[in-house]
Amino acid sequence: MKRVVVGCCGFPVARGKYYSLFKVVELQNTFYELPSIEWAEGVRREAPGDFEFTVKAWQVITHPHTSPTWKKMKRKPSGSPENYGYLKPSKENISAFEKTLTVSRALGARIVILQTPSSMPDNEETIKNVDSFFENAKSLVKNEVIGWEIRGPLLSRGELYRVLEKHNVVQVVDLFRARNPFKGSMKLLYTRLHGIGPGEVNYSYNYTDEDLEKLYNMLVEEDYVEAYVMFNNVRMLNNALRFREIVVEKGGLEIV
């Protein structure tokens, strides 16, 4: 039976309450400001032993220094700002990725998510850079699953999918916007749900039962061993809880 793990991107309620409701969370603070090892170890200790953290990678790896979210960082990374972001194969990016992995390991996290912005250049240089980034980062990865959520025009480039396959990087998608993503040799499906609408995100959207039943059907149809269904909208708490209820009612999937 296919296994489905349901959770939220970030904590919509106090951590202690969240631990009693779900078995997984995708940490968001790791994206905005990479936390200390001490913080990560403390959060790991406070969580139940069977609780899982997934980590959204530090923004400096994926977003250029001109990104608005950079301005909110209290501690800017060392080195040349121009060498950060867009998965460039620079020593700065590789170092930031290594630091992200160190934090993720302190959390006991198995999955690390890279999310690049829609402004990422849609050209051959980007493809070469990404290929080199994953090649250079390969030696740093131990047992982690690396996922990449690609946004913008770059999604249409066929060469990109060869890079994913070459480096066994899972393609992270919103299933309401893209189907049959590359799931890696581990056949892992990771979907981040940003709300339904004409754009790439609609965080204010409230998923209806009809939407959630459609999501259930998509999960029945998709080929995978394990799926992570991570809600990333304003009403993610209620939507995630309701989706889990629907899966239990319909059966056919192992729900966590």
What are these regions (language model features)?
Residues 1-256:
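Residues lining hydrophobic/aromatic ligand-binding pockets adjacent to catalytic sites
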